[in-house]
């Protein structure tokens, strides 16, 4: 079976790395990024303990390679911006091992090392054709503007992210749900003197700052703030003055951690990445089982619990595990994958929505956060971090 993979982010790279040695399958990946891309842009992310467990169980990537470019995620602090602590959760109370804190550029470097030899770069998907035998033929545009075809495939894998071109071609633009939250992200370099350490969230009403330390004296900061509507984030919110209003209490001072973050907000306001929190409808396969979707291309979700890249890792390794069972057709691959992953993904999406309560209008950041350190939420976290599929 000849498999083509569109996109070599987290899900695509891991799938290619795990699948390329499985007997009976030929895997070829394509990515629009240039060959030998060494982009140092991007911010940071946390990877949940469930992704690490999936790698221990199913292989596909060296955990030592990931740990060498990351820091452990052991604690989950929730406080108010004035310094009042609400909870301080030890992840080992709900997981078998800590998660990871890592820069996106470092994560991509590690995962793409497993897929680079099977990837053609500088290929941007433009269209999809079908040969006389019903196999799919992707049409790519190269850097010089020409259109190229790299042969026919029995199965195509959409691993090209939230705005997947392959998903759009086979199923249209997915419907998005917006909960009314604006976000920004920032990577601060040369931050050795920062008071920020492990994963922390700091609330002021329904606005929240999130931060954690990363390797190489970097700190990741993200802000979430109420923002109704859809479309791009309006310019009037993209000022230090407007953002400070969200995170400074009406009375009293802020904690040293928050003061440091606000000072970086003032300095780097023009360097931030802005977006609206959103999720899309889940789609595991299309075209009667000739297209399989992984990661954000299949089920982009709210980022509240940091499960985007984590579930992409689970997806990739689960899909490779299906191939090891030697399915006899592309449709069998897709059906087996959906049966394995459907309930798991829906659970992760539901829990992520539930955890977003403190960011929504009317949500109580204190009561809602306290509930996250108690049952039944702790039991759901254990299920999230322990029951990989």
Q: Across the structure, where does each feature detected by a protein language model lie?
A:
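Conserved N-terminal glycine-rich FAD pyrophosphate-binding loop of Rossmann-like flavoproteins
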Residues: 34-54
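Conserved mid-domain beta->alpha element of the FAD-binding
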Residues: 5-18, 22, 157-158, 184, ...
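Glycine-rich FAD pyrophosphate-binding loop
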Residues: 20-41
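Conserved Rossmann-like nucleotide-cofactor binding loop
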Residues: 11, 35, 163
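Histidine-centered metal-chelating micro-motifs
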Residues: 163-164, 183-185, 207-210, 298-299
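C-terminal auxiliary extensions adjacent to catalytic cores
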Residues: 374-389
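Conserved FAD/dinucleotide-binding core of flavoprotein oxidoreductases
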Residues: 85-90, 94-108, 142-148, 189-274
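Conserved N-terminal helical subregion
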Residues: 1-6, 48-187, 241-244, 386-389
